[in-house]
Amino acid sequence: MPVADTSQLTSGVAERYASSLFDLALEQGAVDSVTADLDRFQAMLDESADLKRFVASPVFSAEDQLKAIVAISEKAGISGFFANFLKVVARNRRLFALPGMIKAFRIIAANHRGEISAEVTSAHALSQAQETELKVALKSVTGKDVTIAVTVDPSILGGLIVKVGSRQIDTSLRTKLSTLKLALKEVG
């Protein structure tokens, strides 16, 4: 299977699972608690390379994945819908798509609240004031409240890469230097 097909498969799986989780959470009035659990689990993924490898690895059996997910959920204080959701995901051997499920759930929840999500990549962590200023600027462009997810990537050197829906604004120093390099090659 080509790489693009694998990515589309993962995305489709993630969106279906996230949609099901959101529908159930909405029906039970638990969207906020599920979102908090999602955030807690995402923070654990971000902090632990071992957990990231475990989630992505097809080597572990469904039974091993289920046992580990139950232990991790209990230790992190994750219960209710999201804990049960994690069990279903592990039992169905879909942990590899969990990061996409979390992302898709956030997008669905934001859309439900009348917000849009923006993915922001920065060379350095943004201060609270910078995040607020960015939200205000994006709201003036989109006309909607904006939630932002910031990723730090030192390789962009400076500036920002902002993705809102299908639009991307790249003001990174890396891109500007690359453009300058191409322009100089054409001149010389």
From Swiss-Prot:
It comes from the Bacteria. It is a peripheral membrane protein. InterPro entries: ATP_synth_OSCP/delta_N_sf, ATPase_OSCP/d_CS, ATPase_OSCP/dsu. Its main location: membrane. NCBIfam families: ATP_synt_delta (TIGR01145), PRK05758.2-2 (NF004402), PRK05758.3-2 (NF004406). Belongs to the ATPase delta chain family. PANTHER family: ATP SYNTHASE DELTA CHAIN. This is ATP synthase subunit delta. It comes from Rhizobium leguminosarum bv. trifolii (strain WSM2304).
